[in-house]
UniProtKB/Swiss-Prot annotation:
Its main location: cytoplasm. Belongs to the UreE family. Involved in urease metallocenter assembly. Binds nickel. Probably functions as a nickel donor during metallocenter assembly. The gene is ureE. Residues 145-195 are annotated as: Disordered. It is found in: Cytoplasm. The keyword Chloroplast does not apply. This is Urease accessory protein UreE. GO terms for biological process: protein folding; protein-containing complex assembly; urea metabolic process. The lineage of its organism: Bacteria, Pseudomonadati, Pseudomonadota, Alphaproteobacteria, Hyphomicrobiales.
């Protein structure tokens, strides 16, 4: 069975290389190694180094370079809205406090149907109604950063080298500052002042 060992994030997907799609709910979009069958019947083995979250529009690259694009499946959700932003923030806090996956938009929060949680949210003054739509819950900060880094690695390669050089410049500056501090080790500590990089004066400053 052909394998897929690489995720191509949606901004980097080339439509001409997409040969099939695979429709997955939010649970199935968090995988490391599993046999999959695409919507058009193509079978392949997802075999990643570590578990990763697949976003709608991402693609799985097969060993021969072809792509299978990911589609988020419609799911039974509830839409949570309030008449003011503070109540929506309060609802978000209670959802997060229970570690419930949630999708947050400007106007609403979406979660998987949960009668107990829905009753609690209504008690907080939120309007709760069932909807059917793709579910794209928020990811943890580390997962989001990792996905961003994976998808933008090539774009940032040159930028990273520039920062590397910049880091060395700072290192030399730190050593120079360290040497300056040693030169003043024997200096009378009664003067409590800082010497600037361009200070050419001696050590006879008097301070009020």
């Amino acid at each position: 069975m052909i394998r897929s060992t690489k995720i191509v994030r949606h901004l980097a997907v080339r439509p001409d290389r997409v040969v099939d799609t695979i429709t997955l709910d939010h649970h199935a979009r968090h995988r490391r190694r599993v046999a999959m069958t695409a919507d058009g019947g193509l079978e392949f083995l997802l075999d990643l180094d570590r578990a990763a979250v697949l976003d709608h529009g991402d693609a799985l690259e097969l060993e021969d370079g072809r792509l299978v694009q990911v589609k988020a499946a419609d799911e039974q959700l509830v839409e949570i809205t309030t008449f003011n932003p503070v109540r929506l923030m309060r609802a978000a806090w209670h959802i997060g406090n229970r570690h419930i996956p949630a999708e947050i938009t400007e106007e609403a929060i979406y979660i998987v149907q949960d009668p107990v949680l829905e009753a609690m949210l209504r008690g907080l003054g939120a309007a709760v109604k069932p909807v059917v739509r793709p579910f794209k819950p928020e990811r943890g900060a580390y997962e989001a950063a990792e996905a961003h880094g994976h998808g933008q690695a090539h774009a940032h390669d040159h930028h990273d080298h520039d920062h590397h050089d910049h880091g060395h410049d700072h290192a030399h500056h730190d050593h120079a500052h360290h040497d300056h501090a040693h030169d003043h080790h024997g200096h009378d500590h009664a003067h409590d002042h800082a010497h600037g990089a361009s200070c050419g004066c001696g050590h006879t400053h008097h301070h009020d």
